[in-house]
From Swiss-Prot:
This is Probable methyl-accepting chemotaxis protein BT9727_0355. Residues 1-13, 220-579 are cytoplasmic. GO terms for molecular function: transmembrane signaling receptor activity. SUPFAM superfamilies: Methyl-accepting chemotaxis protein (MCP) signaling domain. CDD domains: HAMP, MCP_signal, PDC1_HK_sensor. GO terms for biological process: chemotaxis; signal transduction. The chain crosses the membrane at residues 14-34, 199-219. It comes from the Bacteria. The keyword Phosphoprotein does not apply. Residues 223-274 form the HAMP domain. Chemotactic-signal transducers respond to changes in the concentration of attractants and repellents in the environment, transduce a signal from the outside to the inside of the cell, and facilitate sensory adaptation through the variation of the level of methylation.
Length: 579
């Protein structure tokens, strides 16, 4: 039943409920009408029946009735007269079927004495006057009421073999007011059920016709009233299929106004769809621009990483070259110590130089060769330091490139932040990533500045080393000239020992200066080693930072790609609606 009810349309449910309500109302009204009709009919019938009973009673001689009641068998003549009166009343009153008289007192069995019967009744029943007869219960109920009220009463409608009757009981009283007999008249009551049946049939016909008419009227009214709902259902079906090009007919009644609300909702929904389409297109365009920007940023970061790798390789190469420089400088220092010792020895044996001129000439040649070695070593060291100066300038140029790239990265991060802010809520994640990129760019710029400062210090130290090397080179050249002069005038050594001794002292002094300069060179080279080590560590840190920045840029690219995919999917979903 419940499933069947859910399958019915709203119109069918409404009509069915209306029919049930009408049936309930009409049934209630019919029951009330039938009850009123029955009460009215029974009231009329009772009044007519009592009038009939009074008529029968008036035709009888109550004195004769009282006498016959005393002994129905002995009072034969009076009983015959009484029978004639009963027959006369039965013939005159068409509604009376039979009349009879019973005694007022019951015997031990509850039976009443039959005083007299009308002829028609006597021919039908077996009981005779003077005999006792057990009356039906409903008859006895009316009898009890007559005996208690001492007034006429009637039974309810009943049926027997002779028909449908209502018995009127009229009491016969003596002089003291005691009931001595009861005159009973069976009034034909067949009209009562037949009238009820006709009333019921007519009522049912009226109910059916009324329900049919009311159902048809209700069906037409409800169908017309629910027409907007049918339109609304069709509209909802089309909207569910994605068709927004629909406008329902509007009416001013309570149900018709729903269609106007539906039309307004569709118009607003179409506006929302259009705005969402525009927003999706803007998001798609912005995501593509962000993707291009991230690709450019990624390429820039890769270039920075490549430059930092080259810078770190150069710094490592410089760091590995420094020990070689130190070896050469240490060797020069050892040679200068030997020269100093030799000068001292020459000073001691200057007095005997004439005797060792051959040895002196050899020593002079050896000094010349040694000075050539020193000059070559100083020139090599000068070339190395000059190369270091050139490398430092190249590193400075690279740092400038890093600073420029960091500025570009910062600009790209700012541009990504602006684009993310345009995307509102969906761009919050991109704004965070862009901010992280900007911070990394600022850190990289700061690191580049630190590197530039270190390189500046290195260049300053390198320039000082170049000045010292140039000074040492000049001193070596002076020593060479002195040694050559010593060789040229070696033959005159024996003649000018004192002059040689003085020159040896000068050479010893110059050797001490050269030794001191060599020690300064060692210190500068050690500083260069520390600087190269610092370059290596800094470049490693910058390289790691740039790799992290590259990963961040890749994350931004992935997010931009995801955003582009989401915007395309949103456009596909919105494309299902026809606006």
């Amino acid at each position: 039943m419940k499933k069947y009810w859910h399958k019915l349309s709203f119109l069918q449910k409404n009509v069915l409920l209306t029919v049930l309500v009408i049936l309930t109302l009409v049934g209630t009204m019919g029951a009330l009408s039938f009850n009123m009709f029955q009460n009215s009919m029974m009231s009329i019938f009772e009044r007519h029946s009592f009038e009939t009973g009074d008529t029968v009673l008036h035709k009888l001689d109550e004195e004769i009735v009282r006498d016959v009641t005393k002994d129905p068998v002995a009072q034969r003549e009076k009983r015959e007269k009484l029978t004639e009166k009963l027959d006369e009343a039965t013939e005159e009153l068409n509604s009376v079927g039979q009349t009879y008289i019973v005694g007022a007192k019951k015997n031990e069995k509850g039976e009443l004495l039959i005083v007299d019967l009308s002829t028609d009744l006597a021919n039908v029943v077996e009981v005779r006057p003077g005999e006792y007869y057990k009356q039906p219960d409903l008859w006895m109920e009316a009898y009890d009421k007559v005996m208690s009220t001492k007034k006429a009463n009637m039974t309810v409608v009943y049926e027997d073999l002779l028909g449908t009757w209502v018995t009127i009981l009229e009491p016969i009283k003596d002089g003291e007011g005691n009931i001595v007999a009861i005159v009973a008249a069976d009034v034909d009551a067949s009209i009562v059920p037949s009238t009820k049946e006709k009333f019921i049939i007519q009522g049912l016909m009226f109910i059916c016709i009324s329900v049919l008419i009311a159902t048809v009227i209700q069906f037409l009214i409800v169908r017309n009233a629910l027409a907007p709902l049918r339109d609304l259902r069709e509209g909802l079906r089309r909207v569910g299929e994605g068709d927004l090009n629909i406008k329902l007919e509007e009416r001013s009644d309570d149900i018709g106004i729903i269609n106007s609300y539906f039309n307004n909702t569709i118009e607003k929904f179409k506006g929302i769809i259009d705005k969402v389409k525009q927003t999706a297109e803007q998001v798609s365009s912005s995501s593509q621009e962000l993707s291009v920007s991230t690709k450019e940023n990624s390429m820039a970061v890769q270039e920075i990483v490549s430059s930092m790798v080259e810078l770190r390789a150069g710094a490592q190469l410089q760091e590995t070259s420094v020990p070689q420089y130190l070896g050469i400088v240490y060797e020069v220092e050892d040679k200068m110590e030997e020269i100093t010792n030799a000068a001292k020895q020459m000073e001691k044996v200057s007095e005997g130089i004439e005797h060792h001129s051959v040895k002196g000439n050899g020593v002079t040649k050896q000094a010349i060769n040694q000075m050539n070695i020193i000059q070559n070593a100083v020139q090599d060291l000068s070339s190395i330091i000059y190369s270091l100066e050139v490398r430092s300038k190249e590193i400075s140029d690279i740092v400038t490139v890093i600073t420029s790239i960091s500025n570009q990265t910062n600009s790209l991060a700012l541009h990504a932040t602006i684009e993310a802010s345009r995307a509102e809520e969906t761009g919050e994640g991109f704004a965070v990533v862009a901010d992280e990129v900007r911070k990394l760019a600022e850190q990289m710029e700061a690191s580049a500045k630190d590197i530039a400062n270190l390189i500046g210090e290195t260049q300053a130290g390198t320039e000082e080393a170049v000045v010292s090397i140039r000074k040492a080179s000049k001193e070596v050249e002076s020593g060479m000239k002195l040694v050559e002069m010593n060789g040229a005038f070696f033959e005159e050594i024996s003649k000018s020992a004192q002059s040689v001794t003085n020159q040896v002292r000068v050479v010893s002094s110059n050797s001490s200066d050269i030794l001191q300069n060599s020690q300064n060179i060692v210190r500068v080279v050690n500083e260069l080693s520390l600087i190269a080590n610092t370059y290596t560590n800094s470049s490693s840190n910058v390289e790691e930072s740039m790799k992290e920045q590259e990963m961040s840029v890749q994350d931004i690219a992935e997010l931009a790609s995801s955003l582009s995919w989401l915007s395309q999917e949103l456009q596909e979903l919105i494309g299902e609606f026809k606006s």
